[in-house]
């Protein structure tokens, strides 16, 4: 066989020309210094802000500071294995997380990796964790209630779907307990076969908490059958600051999946004070200039861009909603500190919890005078509006009178009556943990309180009266509850039936 030299050289040239084209080209940099969860990297000239990078040992990081001669990278993991001179690779992807219904019932870390030992996540989609909030046009005003199951909140400080309601108070005042009860209260809505428009999925983000606390929280949800419609995102106290900083954004992205697909979700950030502390730590280590209380200048933007993502969308955009319940821990009831005032100004109201009330046995320890809901009343059902209006006024008068009553002992009959009614209503608003009430049950109980059925009872008997009344309504008089639930109103006819039922019960109650 005759082979010409020209042919050989042509084949060789062709192969040489295409040699190595299938090789992967990746932009790499070099670690200049590393420590305290921060790496300074030389190179990576075309990196984007917020881009994910990968170190030699597989640890991930995020580019936060883009400077003239180096890049400041925060490390999502331990920095012990990372050494000076090692290479760092760009991933060309902004930090993202898995989303979808496959996450329900799972516990994940701040990057969406499972940490509950139940195998890989069944999620088909991934979304960026830090995206722009919906604009003005896709939104609509809050008009559906988001029931917490707690009488003092649903009647006096109502929360609507798509609202942002802050839970604020000192340590050990029951902030997480309110969040937990809210999740448990969604169980009747999330029964199998219920319409998607009714269901409310829950996302709980634990930031900087003890692992034992998170484990206990998950255990309660599992025991009560509430884990199946919940997602837990945990960045515990032992996790690096960057993980605690990114966790709320990851949780928010998971909640947004439901909002954008015409479903409803509630997200609880527990708590944002610890996220601000983690962000302050990162910013100071990146040598960004400190501001008030040594927080960086953009700590307001950190929380506002997160909380603005909670929204009620209009019909053209699927009618979905994401409700946010951020938690803030105060020091000695100081709500005028930097982070509390920031978050109060961003949210649509706050539930203010007080240590003194907690120790007096008023639990949930909600200070009804300082707590407000700026948009929730438009989401209240007609039935609740009718009974709540009266209790609000009576409690406000009671608080005013109680302050004066401390000075004088000889009070006239009307003042005495007012104080008597107020103390009974305060007793009525107490509620043990893990026992949320349905809207129609709350309406009946509060109606009985504001119509004077508790006035002659000793304080210690109020709880027993309430429990007995609820048993009666759930048993013999269940049609009253059904009518209120279906019509969402307390008509004169239903009120008359309720009056005769409560009259009959009050006569037999001893």
Swiss-Prot record:
Subcellular location: Cell inner membrane
GO MF terms, alphabetically ordered: ADP binding; ATP binding; proton-transporting ATP synthase activity, rotational mechanism
Gene Ontology CC terms: plasma membrane; proton-transporting ATP synthase complex
Membrane topology note: Peripheral membrane protein
Marked site positions, Required for activity: 371
Keyword set, alphabetical order: ATP synthesis, ATP-binding, Cell inner membrane, Cell membrane, CF(1), Hydrogen ion transport, Ion transport, Membrane, Nucleotide-binding, Translocase, Transport
Family of this protein: Belongs to the ATPase alpha/beta chains family.
Protein name: ATP synthase subunit alpha
């Amino acid at each position: 066989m005759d082979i010409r030299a020209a042919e050989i050289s042509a084949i060789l040239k062709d192969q040489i020309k295409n040699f190595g084209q299938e090789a992967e080209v990746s932009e790499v940099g070099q670690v200049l210094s590393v420590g305290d969860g921060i790496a300074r990297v030389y190179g990576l000239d075309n990196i984007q802000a917020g881009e994910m990078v990968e170190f030699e040992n597989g640890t991930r990081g995020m580019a936060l500071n883009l400077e003239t001669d180096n890049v400041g990278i925060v490390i999502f993991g331990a920095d012990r294995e990372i050494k000076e001179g090692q290479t760092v690779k760009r991933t060309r992807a902004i930090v993202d997380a898995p989303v979808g219904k496959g996450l329900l019932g799972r516990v994940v870390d701040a990057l969406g990796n499972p940490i509950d030992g139940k195998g890989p996540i069944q999620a088909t989609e991934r979304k960026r964790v830090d995206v722009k909030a919906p604009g003005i046009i896709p939104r609509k005003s809050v008009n559906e209630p988001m029931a917490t199951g707690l009488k003092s909140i649903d009647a006096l400080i109502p929360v609507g779907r798509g609202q942002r309601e802050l839970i604020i108070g000192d340590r050990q005042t029951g902030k997480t307990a309110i969040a937990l009860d809210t999740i448990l209260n969604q169980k009747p809505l999330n029964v199998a076969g219920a319409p998607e428009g009714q269901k409310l999925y829950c996302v709980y983000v634990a930031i900087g908490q003890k692992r034992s606390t998170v484990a206990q929280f998950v255990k309660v949800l599992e025991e009560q059958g509430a884990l199946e419609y919940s997602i837990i995102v945990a960045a515990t106290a032992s996790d690096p600051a960057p993980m605690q900083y990114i966790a709320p954004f990851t949780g928010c992205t998971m909640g947004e999946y439901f909002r954008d697909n015409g479903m409803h979700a509630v997200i609880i950030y527990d708590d944002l004070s610890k996220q601000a502390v983690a962000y302050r730590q990162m910013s100071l280590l990146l040598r960004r200039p400190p501001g008030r209380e040594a927080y960086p200048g953009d700590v307001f933007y950190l929380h506002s861009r997160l909380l603005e993502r909670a929204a009620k969308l209009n019909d053209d955009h699927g009618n979905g909603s994401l409700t946010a319940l951020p938690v803030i821990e105060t020091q000695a009831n100081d709500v005028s500190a930097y982070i509390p005032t920031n978050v109060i100004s961003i949210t649509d109201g706050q539930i203010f919890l007080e240590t003194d009330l907690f120790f007096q046995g008023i639990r949930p320890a909600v200070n009804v005078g300082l707590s407000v809901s700026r948009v929730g009343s438009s989401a209240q059902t007609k039935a609740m509006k009718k009974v709540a209006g009266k209790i609000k006024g009576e409690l406000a008068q009671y608080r005013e009178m109680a302050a004066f009553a401390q000075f004088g002992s000889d009070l006239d009959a009307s003042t005495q009556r007012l104080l008597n009614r107020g103390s009974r209503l305060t007793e009525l608003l107490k509620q043990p943990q893990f026992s949320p009430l349905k809207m129609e049950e709350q309406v009946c109980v509060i109606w009985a309180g504001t119509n004077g059925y508790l006035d002659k009872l000793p304080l210690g008997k109020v709880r027993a009266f309430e429990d007995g009344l609820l048993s009666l309504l759930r048993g013999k008089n269940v049609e009253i509850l059904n009518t209120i639930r279906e019509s969402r109103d307390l008509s004169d006819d239903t009120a008359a039936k309720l009056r005769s039922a409560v009259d009959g019960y009050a006569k037999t109650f001893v």
